[in-house]
Amino acid sequence: MSTIDLTLDTFEDTVLGEGITLVDFWASWCGPCRLENRGYAELYERHRAAGFEILAVSVDHDARSWKAAIAKDGATWRHMADLTGWKSPLAARYSVTALPASFLLDREGRIVAKDVRGKALAALG
């Protein structure tokens, strides 16, 4: 697991030029988000060699809870947080008002799918 301090610049540096990136907004206190994490683990392992990345953006306030959830869920992909909760500029940029929320981005950072989950997400690979 790698964690990155969240700014709009670090976000863009992280997703641009990659292959397909799933940007997943979540929080340690969000039960459905935590279930999604477990489902992402298999998908990530299966497709990361082909350029698929997951960037999890937390809307947590507490770093300890955030990092503990990452470890417990076995979420080995990249994680970002600014620990401002719903005041996160990135959550505002993507108009995220409920969790879980996810966006599939192409290598130019364009949204190609929104809130794709489970079997529908696996079918895209």
Where are these regions (language model features)?
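Conserved beta-strand segments of alpha/beta enzyme cores
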Residues: 2, 53, 76-78
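Short, internal strand/loop/helix patches
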Residues: 67-103, 107-108
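Conserved strand-loop elements at the edges of beta-sheets that form or border functional pockets
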Residues: 5-8, 59, 98
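Proteins that catalyze or organize thiol-disulfide redox chemistry
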Residues: 1-23, 28, 38-41, 45, ...
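Structural microenvironment flanking redox-active thiols in thiol-disulfide oxidoreductases
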Residues: 35-73, 86-91
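Hydrophobic beta-strand anchors of alpha/beta hydrolase catalytic cores
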Residues: 22-23, 54, 102
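Active-site-proximal beta-strand/loop segments in catalytic clefts of secreted hydrolases
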Residues: 25, 57-59, 82
